[in-house]
């Protein structure tokens, strides 16, 4: 049996082993836990919290799963190379539980709902003081189809909502939700923690350029030195209220905030083009957010480079057809689609809407087309899978900026090479 098949079959059994020892270290640490969950946007929220709370907290960067969070508590890194590392981790966990302890007052932890029972597994252990439920959508939908087939839920959306609800249910003090989400409102109706609905429509003004964003609320302006979607008004209002609750100073100037790779990063490109890099992932909820940002962005010549939406299972065709309307609403000068799903489903829908698109399965052909066509006055906005980060790397004005792109780890480099994409 391969390691991958073993992990899938015995996922939670093995995860319980690491959680057991992590709990020993966790009890010695005894932090105030702030949990961040949702279908998309978790990492951006984490980054904003780090900007405000600083060194008073430990942050679970690159760790959000049933394995990742216990590893993080124990001060261990997960699998980054040889599978033999599992043996070392199994041996190291008991010793780390005795000798390792974080000392920060707060633990800001990202919790994913990638598979059924994962959020539940972590929520019942960590029992956070505060939960921030950022979003709800059909990310990892394919993982929840069995739950629907087995009759546990009517549809995939209901199954995903139920999974995320485990976190608010196990929260002791405060739960922040989107006031516009009927799913979140219904899911948190009877929990014991205080529910704080955040109204994004209280935002007074939103101005976005390829290299900056300003959000205005009342007399306060929140400034970023990169483009951000309008949707993160939710994050801003949450962070401001949370800092007041924690009795910590709130800083509305986010110009020095370090953003995670592939989350609306800004780069200068060859010939002077502007590059907006949102290539980290692609769910319909994040696609909607980024394409809305593109529509509102102050830029003369907008090009969209869109990759496939993955992990959609039986919803794949429907989601990619919906994508066409979102793209058309931007009124882009050019559209480049990369991937079999966008080529099969999105391109024909765009044609019906009167939007021409260049569709290819090969990132190299997309790059070739872009390099031949740009004049230097364009703003290229990237969103989706299919190794768009490789295309961006080849378009950078400064090759050193490549280290700021997503998927720099060895495994990702090897996957790109298997596609013939050198780095």
Where are these regions (language model features)?
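ATP-dependent carboxylate-amine ligase
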Residues: 1-18, 29, 54-55, 229, ...
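ATP-dependent carboxylate-amine ligase catalytic core
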Residues: 23-27, 54-162, 233
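Acidic, Mg2+-coordinating active-site environments of NTP-dependent enzymes
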Residues: 29-31, 103-105, 123-274, 299-300, ...
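Short beta-strand segments
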Residues: 35-37, 110, 133-135, 178, ...
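A conserved segment at the C-terminal end of the G1
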Residues: 36, 44-61
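Residue-level detector of alpha-helix initiation sites
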Residues: 40-44, 113, 233, 386
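Short, acidic/turn-prone active-site loops that include or flank metal/cofactor-
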Residues: 62-65, 135-138, 200-203, 359-366, ...
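Short beta->alpha connector loops
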Residues: 112-116, 181-182, 281-282, 363-364
């Amino acid at each position: 049996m391969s390691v991958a098949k073993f992990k899938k079959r015995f996922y939670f059994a093995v995860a319980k082993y690491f959680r057991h020892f992590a709990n020993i270290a966790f009890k010695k640490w005894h932090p105030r836990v702030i949990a961040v969950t949702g279908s998309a946007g978790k990492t951006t929220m984490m980054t904003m919290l780090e900007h405000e709370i600083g060194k008073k907290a430990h942050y679970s960067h690159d760790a959000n799963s049933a394995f990742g969070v216990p590893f993080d508590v124990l001060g261990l890194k997960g699998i980054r190379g040889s599978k033999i590392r599992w043996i070392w981790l199994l041996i190291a966990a008991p010793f780390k539980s005795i000798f390792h302890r974080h000392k920060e007052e707060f633990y800001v932890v990202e919790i994913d709902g990638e598979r059924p029972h994962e959020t539940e597994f972590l929520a019942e252990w960590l029992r956070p003081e505060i939960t921030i439920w950022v979003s709800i959508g059909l990310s990892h939908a394919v993982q929840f189809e069995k739950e629907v087939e087995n009759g546990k839920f009517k549809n995939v959306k209901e199954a995903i909502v139920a999974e995320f609800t485990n976190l608010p249910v196990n929260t002791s003090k405060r739960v922040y939700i989107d006031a516009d989400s009927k799913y979140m409102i219904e899911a948190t109706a009877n929990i014991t923690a205080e529910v704080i609905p955040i109204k994004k429509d209280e935002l007074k003004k939103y101005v976005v350029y390829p290299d900056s964003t300003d959000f205005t609320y009342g007399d306060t302006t929140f400034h970023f030195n990169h483009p951000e979607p309008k949707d993160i008004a939710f994050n801003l209002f949450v962070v401001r209220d949370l800092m007041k609750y924690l009795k910590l100073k709130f800083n509305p100037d986010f110009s020095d905030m370090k953003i995670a790779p592939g989350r609306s990063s800004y780069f200068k490109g060859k010939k002077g083009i502007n590059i907006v890099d949102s290539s980290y992932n692609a769910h319909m909820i994040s696609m909607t957010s980024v394409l809305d940002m593109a529509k509102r962005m102050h830029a003369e010549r907008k090009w969209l480079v869109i990759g496939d939406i993955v992990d959609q299972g039986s919803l794949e065709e429907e989601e990619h057809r919906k994508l066409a309307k979102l793209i058309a609403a931007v009124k882009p000068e050019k559209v480049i689609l990369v991937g079999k799903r966008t080529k099969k489903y999105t391109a024909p829908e765009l044609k019906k809407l009167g939007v021409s698109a260049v569709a290819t399965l090969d990132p190299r052909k997309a790059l070739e087309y872009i390099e031949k066509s740009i004049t230097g006055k364009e703003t290229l906005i990237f969103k989706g899978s299919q190794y768009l980060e490789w295309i961006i790397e080849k378009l950078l004005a400064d090759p050193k900026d490549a280290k700021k792109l997503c998927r720099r780890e060895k495994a990702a480099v090897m996957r790109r090479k298997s596609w013939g994409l050198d780095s």
